[in-house]
Amino acid sequence: MRVIKVGGSVVPMLDKILDTSSLHGNSIIVHGGSRYVDEMARKLGVKVERLVSPSGVMFRRTTRRVLDVYVAALMRANRELVSFLRERGIDAIGVSGLDGVVLAKRKKLVKAVVNGKVIAIRDDYSGVIKSINVTLLKNYLKVGIPVIASIAYDPEENVPLNVDGDKVAYHVAIAMKAKELRFLSDTAFLIDGNVVERIPLEDFDEYLRYAGGGMKKKLMMARKALESGVKKVVIEGLNGRTVIS
């Protein structure tokens, strides 16, 4: 089993980074859609605010209006990705948390650092992933390759939620007992402009301090995946790949 996370920024250029000939019935694709969210928000005049968590990871503040844009944008990305795969003879099946694949609980508060102070945000529609519907995914795998949009569903509040695509990929990999987790991004991990081709797990912390933003988040998910049974994690960009094992 292999789980492939496709970053929203690379969906339009998948033919340059994804070897579709290697896809088989034991693969699951998860995708994000930040590029699509930003583009749709601009067209609709919806302000998207980006904040930084106390751990240093940037995130999008998800108001109810932003949530509506988020869901619509990710479903558009999902359609494009599924169409790309089907045009190449792959039986791709578009799904999301709204189909019951990814269940989450809405966060009661979100912490962010503003002007050097930690503040609490209580009107956010982001979630903590609670479970992956393994039975449903196994049924999808019988007929094709599931392509999961990173939208979760909160059954208690009956609302969709914004969840991080890298975290969705991690949870799917663990739930499905995947041997490999692959992140497709616009860039591999760089230090001083050079691609880091391999990160031994025993030296992980040394490399982590050079990472920032989305790459730091990917590396953190990579370590959790390896510690939870995944054998290999690959961060693959247009400029090369970083293997973590």
From Swiss-Prot:
Homology family: Belongs to the acetylglutamate kinase family. LysZ subfamily.
Binding residue positions for substrate: 60, 162
Residues under site feature: Transition state stabilizer: 5, 218
Pfam families registered for this protein in UniProt: AA_kinase
Chief location of this protein within or outside the cell: cytoplasm
Gene Ontology MF terms in the entry: acetylglutamate kinase activity; ATP binding; N2-acetyl-L-aminoadipate kinase activity
Keyword Acetylation listed: no
Role: Involved in both the arginine and lysine biosynthetic pathways. Phosphorylates the LysW-bound precursors glutamate (for arginine biosynthesis), respectively alpha-aminoadipate (for lysine biosynthesis).
GO CC terms in record: cytoplasm
First-level EC class: transferase
Reaction equations catalysed: [amino-group carrier protein]-C-terminal-N-(1,4-dicarboxybutan-1-yl)-L-glutamine + ATP = [amino-group carrier protein]-C-terminal-N-(1-carboxy-5-phosphooxy-5-oxopentan-1-yl)-L-glutamine + ADP; [amino-group carrier protein]-C-terminal-gamma-(L-glutamyl)-L-glutamate + ATP = [amino-group carrier protein]-C-terminal-gamma-(5-phospho-L-glutamyl)-L-glutamate + ADP
Enzyme Commission number(s) of this protein: 2.7.2.17, 2.7.2.19
Subcellular location per the Swiss-Prot or TrEMBL entry: Cytoplasm
Pathway: Amino-acid biosynthesis; L-lysine biosynthesis via AAA pathway; L-lysine from L-alpha-aminoadipate (Thermus route): step 2/5; Amino-acid biosynthesis; L-arginine biosynthesis
Cysteine disulfide partners in this protein: none
Assigned keywords, A-Z: Amino-acid biosynthesis, Arginine biosynthesis, ATP-binding, Cytoplasm, Kinase, Lysine biosynthesis, Nucleotide-binding, Transferase
InterPro entries xrefs: AceGlu_kinase-like_sf, AcgluKinase_fam, Asp/Glu/Uridylate_kinase, LysZ
Gene3D superfamilies in the record: Acetylglutamate kinase-like
GO BP terms in the entry: arginine biosynthetic process via ornithine; L-arginine biosynthetic process; lysine biosynthetic process via aminoadipic acid
Protein name in UniProt: Putative [LysW]-aminoadipate/[LysW]-glutamate kinase
